[in-house]
Amino acid sequence: MPAATVDHSQRICEVWACNLEEEMKRIRQVTRKFNYIAMDTEFPGVVARPIGEFRSNADYQYQLLRCNVDLLKIIQLGLTFMNEQGEYPPGTSTWQFNFKFNLTEDMYAQDSIELLTSSGIQFKKHEEEGIETMYFAELLMTSGVVLCEGVKWLSFHSGYDFGYLIKILSNSKLPDEEVDFFEILRLFFPIIYDVKYLMKSCKNLKGGLQEVAEQLELERIGPQHQAGSDSLLTGMAFFKMREMFFEDHIDDAKYCGHLYGLGSGSSYVQNGTGNAYEEEANKQQS
């Protein structure tokens, strides 16, 4: 099978509090042979903007991320497992974790919740059957998925995605300074390829995840704007791009560990393409 070709026998496993332990056991087995993990999250938008003086636009973007991740809760996490050739494990390839979220008590941006509701996210079920993030973090820490240099993470414009994961895993607010954020990031996720960052070297590729997938002629499985389907599409995009634009080899020195819109990945500061969070928010719309 060519890398990242759609096979409709692949299925996305829904994970709630009731089946979390069972599915994490399966993941511990899967990750031994399928060590490329494509990741996406769904979160409740942006509700705050930092005030004060900032050293640079890049500093402002990190502080914007930090204040919102600190205030808000993750709604979904999607993890898709693939091997070096872009092949999936037999049966389930993607796990969609649904976290506890209460529309009455938790903060959110109204437009984001409306989009997620229209995409099929069941907020009543999240309130009643959602996963507790602290327990999820305990299981994830011993899963062989994080803190492991043999695992390669694939993402798309993922500053906020990794921000929420770091918040969950460390059970604390994000660090005040971006440099400390990247230090923690490298500890939990030593190898990351952000597809949006890779696109800088791919002629004519542009836009959000869905637009990129269409340009690459990839077929989505599952509903758009849900973390499982988006993580699966992110993994497909990485392997298709690696084949088409990188001769099946990614230069780690140039691309590994960079997140689009943050740190050295903040090319928008120089080229004037605007606010990185607005692009991140638009990623959910596209």
Swiss-Prot record:
The gene is cnot7. A divalent metal cation 1 binds at D40, D161, E278. SUPFAM superfamilies: Ribonuclease H-like. Binds 2 divalent metal cations per subunit with RNAase activity being higher in presence of Mn(2+) than of Mg(2+) or Co(2+). InterPro entries: CNOT7/CNOT8/Pop2, RNase_CAF1, RNaseH-like_sf, RNaseH_sf. This is CCR4-NOT transcription complex subunit 7. It catalyses: Exonucleolytic cleavage of poly(A) to 5'-AMP. Its EC number is 3.1.13.4. Keywords: Cytoplasm, Exonuclease, Hydrolase, Magnesium, Metal-binding, Nuclease, Nucleus, Repressor, RNA-binding, RNA-mediated gene silencing, Transcription, Transcription regulation, Translation regulation. GO terms for molecular function: 3'-5'-RNA exonuclease activity; metal ion binding; poly(A)-specific ribonuclease activity; RNA binding; RNA exonuclease activity. It comes from Danio rerio (Zebrafish). Coiled coil: none annotated.
